[in-house]
Amino acid sequence: MKQEQNSFSRLWTYLRAYRLEVCLSIFLKILSVVMSVVEPFVLGLAITELTKNLMDMAKGLAEAGLNTSYIAIIMTLYLFRGVLYELGSYYSNYFMTNAVQKTVQDMRNDLSHKINHIPVSYFDRHQFGDLLGRFTSDVETVSNALQQSFLQIVNAIFTLLFVISMVLYLNIQLGLVVILSIPITYFSARFIMKKSQPYFKEQADVLGTMNGFVQENLTGFNVLKLYVREKSSQEEFHDITYHLQKVGFKANFISGLMMPILNGISDLTYLIIALFGGLQVLAGRLTVGNMQAFVQYVWQINQPIQNLTQLAGQLQSAKSSLDRIFQVMDEPDEVADVTETLSGDLTGQVSFKNVDFQYVADKPLIRNFNLEVKPGEMVAIVGPTGAGKTTLINLLMRFYDVTAGSITVDGHDIRHLSRQDYRKQFGMVLQDAWLYEGTIKENLRFGNLEATDEEIVEAAKAANVDHFIRTLPGGYNMEMNQESSNISLGQKQLLTIARALLADPKILILDEATSSVDTRLELLIQKAMKNLMKGRTSFVIAHRLSTIQEADKILVLKDGQIIEQGNHQSLLADKGFYYELYNSQFSNKKAE
C-alpha cells in the first residue's frame, strides 16, 4: 500500500504544475454532476403541478386550471440546467485533457532525460522491448487513467453524495431504502469483478502467446514450408485458440452476470420504492413528482457504483505502470561528470595501466592489464565468442569505469574528462550498422551537423559508397525506412564508414565486414576501412585472422582474460593460443 501511495503521490508532483487546470476540471465536473442530479427533482416539480391540476379538474373544482407561468419557469430552469450540464461536462474534459497531455509530455521528457544519463550497464540488464514498453504503453496507461478514471471517480463520488442528499431531503424513509441498496450493489459488483479478473488476465496472456506464435510463423514462413511443418503448426495454433476460447468464455460469462444482478437489485429497490412510495402518495405525505424523482435516483445510483468497481482494476493497472516508469527514473545516474574539457584535438595515444575490471563484485574479468598504443597504430582484438572483446571497447569508450588502474588518452585519465568532449573524439563502425529513419544525407551528417554537401560527397567517395548512392532513387535524398531494410547490410556498413569519415574522429572502434556480404562488397568495405584508419588510432574487433596481419598490436582474449599480445609474426612464433586459432581458420579455409 505504501508503494501504491508513493507512486500516486509522485504522479501528483507532475500534475501539481497544472493544478489550475485540474481544479477547474474538478469544479466543472461537480457542476455537471449537480445539474444531472437536480434533473429528476425539477421534472418532479413539473409533474406534481400537472397531476395536481388534473386531480382538481377531476374533482370539478372551479379554480382548476394549469399554472402556465409556473410550468414555464420550471421548463426554463430545466433548459438552463441542461446548458450548464453540457458546458460543465465539455470544459471539464477540456481542462483535464490539457493537464494530462502536458503531464504525459513532462513524464516522457523526464524518461528521455533519464535514459541519456543512466549507465550502459542498465541496458545490459534490461531488454529493449521492456524499456520501449515503459516509454509507450505504460505512459499511455497512466494517461488514460488520468484522463478517464480521474474524472469518473469524481463523477461517481459526487453523484452518490448528491443523490443520497436528495433522497433524504425528499423522504427519509424511502431515502434509507435507497442508501441500503448502495453497499449491496457495490459489493455484488466487486465480487463479480474479482471472480472474473483472473480469467481476463489469463485471456490477455493467451492472446499474447497467440500473437507471438503468429509473428514467429509469419517470420519463418519459408522454413515452415521447407520442413513441411504446416500441419503441426496448425494443430498448435488450434490448441492456443481453443484455450483462448475457453478462457474468454469464462471471463465474459462471469462478468456478464454483473448487469443482470445489478438490474435485479435495482428492480427490487424499485419495487420497494413503488410499494411504500405509493402508500405515502395516497397518504398525502409524498407528491407524485417526488415519487418519480425517487425512481430516477435509484437508476442514477447504479452507474457510479458500477464505475467505481471497474475503476479499481484500471487504477491497479495504472499503479503497475507508474511503478515501472518510476523504476527507470530511480535508477542511479552515471558517475557525475567532470568539468575538465579538452583544450584541443587528441593525437590518439592510449595507455592501459594496471587495469582491473569486473562486471559483478568478486568476479574479476580483467586483471592487471597494461597496453601502450601510439598515435595512428592499429590494435586488433581477437578471441572466441564471449571472450570479452566488447569489454575492452566498453572500458575505452567509458561506458564502464575501470575497477582499478587507469586508462589515459594523451596523458589524460579518461575519468577526469568530460564524457561529451571525450566521446566526440571517437568513431565507431560495427557489423550491426545503425541508421535511423531519414535521408541518406541526414544519416551521413549525423556525426557532423555542420558538414557541407561537398564534404558529404567526398566522404562517400572515400568510403566507396558514392556510386551506389547515386544509383538509388533520390540519391543522397532517398528516405531510409525505419529498419533501413531498403538497403543491404554491407551497404549500411559502407554508409557508416562514410559517416565516421565525415565526423573525422581521432580514435576508431571498428568491426570487420559482416560475413553475409558478397566478396566484391567485402573488398569495398575493407578498402573503405583502410581509408578510414589512415592517420588514426584504431581498435579492430577481428573475426578472421587473415585480415589483421598488418596490425601493430594484437590482443588475444580467452575467458575474459588477455592471454597474449604482440604482432602477427611474434604471436605465431610463440605458438600459443593465437597460433592455434590461426591454424584452425587456415585449415578450415583449405578444407572449404
Where are these regions (language model features)?
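An intracellular "coupling" helix at the cytosolic face of ABC transporter transmembrane type-1 domains
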Residues: 14-20, 120-121, 139-146, 150, ...
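Juxtamembrane loop-to-helix connectors within ABC transporter transmembrane domains
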Residues: 15, 96-100, 116-160
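Alpha-helical segments in transporter systems
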Residues: 20-45, 74, 78, 93-97, ...
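Transmembrane helices of ABC transporter permease
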Residues: 21-34, 148-202, 273-286, 303
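Transmembrane helix-loop-helix hairpins at lipid-water interfaces of multipass membrane proteins
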Residues: 23-88, 169-173, 284-288
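Cytosolic ends of transmembrane helices, especially the final helix of ABC transmembrane type-1 domains
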Residues: 206, 229, 253, 270, ...
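ABC-type nucleotide-binding domain
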Residues: 337, 343-592
